[in-house]
Amino acid sequence: MTDTTAHKYPLLATPHVRLHGTVDDAMYDSFCNQLAACPKDGMLVVTITTLGGDPEVARAMGDDIRLIREFQGRDILFLGKVAVYSAGATFMSAFPVEHRFLTHGTRLLLHERQITKTINLNGPLRMVVASLQAALNEVETSVAIEEEGFRDLIKGSKVPFDELHEKAPSNWYIEAEEARSLGLVLDII
């Protein structure tokens, strides 16, 4: 028999909620349906494999996890498999570090939020100023949300905010072993 940590965490072998693919409305629907079918008490296990997607959907799923934890007093474990990129890492940030696991060979991708926007300046000057201010407000709010998520992700880990803030613009890929050594996850199975 090979040396393995799996025997320490037998619950991870039979997850209650299995998510894969793009983080989008369809994943959120699947997530809600699977949660509704879960046992009403005891620890839950949620797995995800994703190349990313909509960060706001990831935040909504994470908020559901937080509400279950706070209102029902339940422990919920996170298991990232193969790829936990972008919005997947946003979802992972909803789980305390001591409830996060990755499978061998899994990679995390942490990066800044992206925006593509064309601003058409046309009309009375005050309307132009208002349009520019609205776009700036959108960007500033998105940066604030991103920073909140980054702080949640690294809370309880060895990663200083400044390091994540410095590496995120150029896509920070983190191997499972590095994630464990940085304290971003409890263990690798």
Predicted region positions:
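Terminal-region recognition feature
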Residues: M1-I189
